Amino acid sequence: MALGGAFSIFMTLCLSCLLILIAWKRTSRGGKLPPGPTPIPFLGNLLQVRIDATFQSFLKLQKKYGSVFTVYFGPRPVVILCGHEAVKEALVDQADDFSGRGEMPTLEKNFQGYGLALSNGERWKILRRFSLTVLRNFGMGKRSIEERIQEEAGYLLEELHKVKGAPIDPTFYLSRTVSNVICSVVFGKRFDYEDQRFRSLMKMINESFVEMSMPWAQLYDMYWGVIQYFPGRHNRLYNLIEELKDFIASRVKINEASFDPSNPRDFIDCFLIKMYQDKSDPHSEFNLKNLVLTTLNLFFAGTETVSSTLRYGFLLLMKYPEVEAKIHEEINQVIGTHRTPRVDDRAKMPYTDAVIHEIQRLTDIVPLGVPHNVIRDTHFRGYFLPKGTDVYPLIGSVLKDPKYFRYPEAFYPQHFLDEQGRFKKNDAFVAFSSGKRICVGEALARMELFLYFTSILQRFSLRSLVPPADIDIAHKISGFGNIPPTYELCFMAR
C-alpha cells in the first residue's frame, strides 16, 4: 500500500477515536442525544449491532433503551426510531425537520448527492416536484399507466402459458414484467423478454439489491472511511451501479437524437425539455447528472421492490392455500374469468386488497428504512438532535408494531379487514415510508401489485413443489433489504 494511503488510514483512525470520544462525552454529560449503549473508540457499537442482523439488533436495543435511542456507526452517532408513534412524530409531525437524506456510504461514490433519492435541499425539492408531476401526467395521458400495466401483465400471462405448468423460478419473469412498466414511462418503450441487454440489466439490479443487503454493506456503512481504501465487495456494487448508469446515459443519447420538445414521449424527454429551457442557467438542477441518476432511481426502485413483493406474495399464498382460494373466489365474483382486471375493481375486492397489504406488511422489503437527516438543530421527545444527525426510522418496527397489529409476526389478512369483511386502513401501514420522503412511486406500485396479483390469479393457480407446511418463508438475506428465498413453483392454468 502506498505511504499516502497508509497515512490516510492512520489519520482516519485517530480522527474516528477523537470524534467518538467528543460525541459520547457531550451526550453523556449534557444528555442531548437519546440514550444508547456506550461506544468503543473507532468500533462504535459494533459489539451491540450485528452486521448480519442489524434490524434484529436494533429491536433488542429498543427493549433496553426505548423507542428512541442512539448507536454509533464507527465514530458517527445515528438516532434510531422504533414503532409507529416515534416514526410518525418524526416523519409526519416534524416532517420538515427530518426531511433530509442521511448518509448511504455504499452508494455515495456513485451518486455524490445527485438524483432524486439521495439528494438534499433545493435540489431534492425540485427533482421531487418534477418527478411527481411527470408520473402524474403520464397516469392521465393518452395511454394511462393502468393501461401500460394491463398490457405488460398480458405479455407475462402469455409467457406463463408457454411454460405449461412446468416448475420455474419466478424471479426474472417478475422482474422483467414489472421493469417494463417503468421502462415504458422513463424510456418510452418496453423490452422483449428475450432481449439479452435487458436480461443483463435485470440481473444487475437484482445483484445490486442483494449486495446492498449483505453484511459487508452494513460494515461498510459503519467504517467506510477506512474500508474504502481496501479492495473488496464494495467495488463490486460500485461497478454494478456504474454499468446501470451507463445504460441510462445511452438511453438519454437515443432520446436526444430524435427529440421533439413539442411531443415528449417519456420521462427523459420531459427532463430534456427542462434542460433546454434552463441551458443558460449554470446553476440549474436540470442537468445531465440529475437526469441520469433520477432516471436510475426510478428504474431501480420501480423494478426491484414490486417484483420482490410479488415473489414473497406467491410464496405466502402457496403456504396458505386457503387464502389463495378466497382470492380466486373474489376474482370470480367481481371480475369473472374473461375480463381484464381494472384498478377500480380494488374497491369491490376487500379481501384481495387486505391480502396484498398483509404481504407488504409481513415481508417488509426495506426494514431499516432509508436514512433521514435532520436539516436543523431539532428538539424531539425531550432530546436534542444537532443539525446533520442521521436518523433511521425503522419501517419494519412500524409494520410489526404489536400496538397496531394483533399478530405482528404472522400472516393474518384480517389485520386489514373489519368485522363486516370491509377493507380497514391501518395508520401503521407505512410500506412506502411516510412524510415528505414518502416513495414517489407509491401510486404506481399499488396499481402494479393489485393488477399483477389479480391478473395472474385469474388465470392460474399456484402449485408448490413441497407441502405447504414445508415452505420456508424466511428471508434469504436481511440487511438494507429483505431478500426473498429462491424457490420454484408451477403456474397451473385454471
UniProtKB/Swiss-Prot annotation:
Olfactory epithelium. GO terms for biological process: epoxygenase P450 pathway; sensory perception of smell; xenobiotic metabolic process. Its main location: endoplasmic reticulum. Its cofactor is heme. One of its GO terms (molecular function) is arachidonate epoxygenase activity. It is found in: Endoplasmic reticulum membrane; Microsome membrane. InterPro entries: Cyt_P450, Cyt_P450_CS, Cyt_P450_E_grp-I, Cyt_P450_E_grp-I_CYP2A-like, Cyt_P450_sf, Cytochrome_P450_fam2. This is Cytochrome P450 2G1. Its EC number is 1.14.14.1. SUPFAM superfamilies: Cytochrome P450. Pfam families: p450 (PF00067). Keywords: Endoplasmic reticulum, Heme, Iron, Membrane, Metal-binding, Microsome, Monooxygenase, Olfaction, Oxidoreductase, Sensory transduction. GO terms for cellular component: cytoplasm; endoplasmic reticulum membrane; intracellular membrane-bounded organelle. It is a peripheral membrane protein. It comes from Rattus norvegicus. Disulfide bonds: none annotated. Belongs to the cytochrome P450 family. Cytochromes P450 are a group of heme-thiolate monooxygenases. This isozyme seems to be implicated in olfaction. It catalyses: an organic molecule + reduced [NADPH--hemoprotein reductase] + O2 = an alcohol + oxidized [NADPH--hemoprotein reductase] + H2O + H(+). It is an enzyme of class 1 (oxidoreductase). Heme binds at C439.
